[in-house]
Amino acid sequence: MQAQIVNKIFEIFSKNNPKPQTALIYKNDFTLLVAVILSARATDISVNLVTKHLFETYNTPEKILALGEEGLKKYIKSIGLFNSKAKNIIASCQILIKNYQASIPNDFKELVKLPGVGRKTANVVLNCLFAMPTMAVDTHVFRVSKRIGLAKGNTTVIVEKELLQIIDEKWLTHAHHWLVLHGRYICKARKPSCRICHIKEYCEYYINTFAS
């Protein structure tokens, strides 16, 4: 896809939603990290339902450790993979306290050392907390990017690299959120709402399916 078309797409995203934000509800840097860990293979809505109560009291690494793994499980048991997530969160709390004075590191290599933190989670944290121009590729971003024509790769890592190359840096602070929101509400997996899509005239899928 040509650079001028990519810019046009993100100009439209920016005009319609100048300051997109994560749908995850959090109180501080640490609670965002926990929320993102919990969001793996879970919806933001389901995560917010449990963290609403969890974060009222337990919103620091020290407090989560005091709660303990079994106590944490009771709060998050409605979320998929809650057993492994509880174990990872407790282990991450221990590392944060021991190595980072209970703060969240602003370095990708340090973040992915934390149990339960993979490439996507680290990129979300760096983007949301530190406004770094990262590209977290979840299922929405992966699908939308390929459908629009922004990327062609068959893995999330390849798509991430393609997006970082093709998207102008001035858009990267918000690009992840725009693509997620577009995938969640417009460019849905089974039935994309192409007729009401603001970027359809630039979308390869729409052009090939409806405009040809």
Swiss-Prot record:
Keyword annotations of the record: 4Fe-4S, DNA damage, DNA repair, DNA-binding, Glycosidase, Hydrolase, Iron, Iron-sulfur, Lyase, Metal-binding
Cofactor binding note from Swiss-Prot or TrEMBL: Binds 1 [4Fe-4S] cluster.
Catalytic reaction list: 2'-deoxyribonucleotide-(2'-deoxyribose 5'-phosphate)-2'-deoxyribonucleotide-DNA = a 3'-end 2'-deoxyribonucleotide-(2,3-dehydro-2,3-deoxyribose 5'-phosphate)-DNA + a 5'-end 5'-phospho-2'-deoxyribonucleoside-DNA + H(+)
CDD domains (UniProt xref): ENDO3c (cd00056)
Cofactor(s) essential for the protein: [4Fe-4S] cluster
Tagged with keyword Cytoplasm: no
Broad EC category: lyase
Task performed by this protein: DNA repair enzyme that has both DNA N-glycosylase activity and AP-lyase activity. The DNA N-glycosylase activity releases various damaged pyrimidines from DNA by cleaving the N-glycosidic bond, leaving an AP (apurinic/apyrimidinic) site. The AP-lyase activity cleaves the phosphodiester bond 3' to the AP site by a beta-elimination, leaving a 3'-terminal unsaturated sugar and a product with a terminal 5'-phosphate.
Binding site for [4Fe-4S] cluster: 187, 194, 197, 203
UniProt-listed InterPro entries: DNA_glycosylase, Endonuclease-III-like_CS2, Endonuclease3_FeS-loop_motif, HhH-GPD_domain, HhH_base_excis_C, HhH_motif, Nth
All residue ranges annotated as the HhH domain in the record: 108-127
Pfam families: HHH, HhH-GPD
Protein name, UniProt field: Endonuclease III
Membership in a protein family: Belongs to the Nth/MutY family.
Keyword Heme on entry: no
GO-annotated biological processes: base-excision repair, AP site formation
E.C. no: 4.2.99.18
Source species of the chain: Rickettsia typhi (strain ATCC VR-144 / Wilmington)
Gene Ontology molecular functions: 4 iron, 4 sulfur cluster binding; class I DNA-(apurinic or apyrimidinic site) endonuclease activity; DNA binding; DNA N-glycosylase activity; metal ion binding
